[in-house]
């Protein structure tokens, strides 16, 4: 179920402040963040965010196609190593 239009998109307040200061300073730096639940807004386009995946910060460069999605969608939390093969079956 999607969020009510009356409420608007959710973005943590500190994230808006950090993005505004980074854009006004003109520096190209990665903005570290832990808020995977925040929605990507149009004013974030062109900025790079380090989205935490539980272990490290994954750099995500925001493009226009990402607007409206959540930051957590672009930083996977689980690593898939594939199913291990059965060594007994290979022998025989």
From Swiss-Prot:
Pfam families from the UniProt entry: Ribosomal_S19
Source taxon at top rank: Bacteria
Swiss-Prot/TrEMBL keywords: Ribonucleoprotein, Ribosomal protein, RNA-binding, rRNA-binding
One biological process term in Gene Ontology: ribosomal small subunit assembly
Molecular function as annotated in GO: rRNA binding; structural constituent of ribosome
InterPro entries linked: Ribosomal_uS19, Ribosomal_uS19_bac-type, Ribosomal_uS19_CS, Ribosomal_uS19_SF
One GO cellular component, as annotated: small ribosomal subunit
Task performed by this protein: Protein S19 forms a complex with S13 that binds strongly to the 16S ribosomal RNA.
Family: Belongs to the universal ribosomal protein uS19 family.
Protein name: Small ribosomal subunit protein uS19
Source organism of this protein record: Parvibaculum lavamentivorans (strain DS-1 / DSM 13023 / NCIMB 13966)
Gene encoding the protein: rpsS
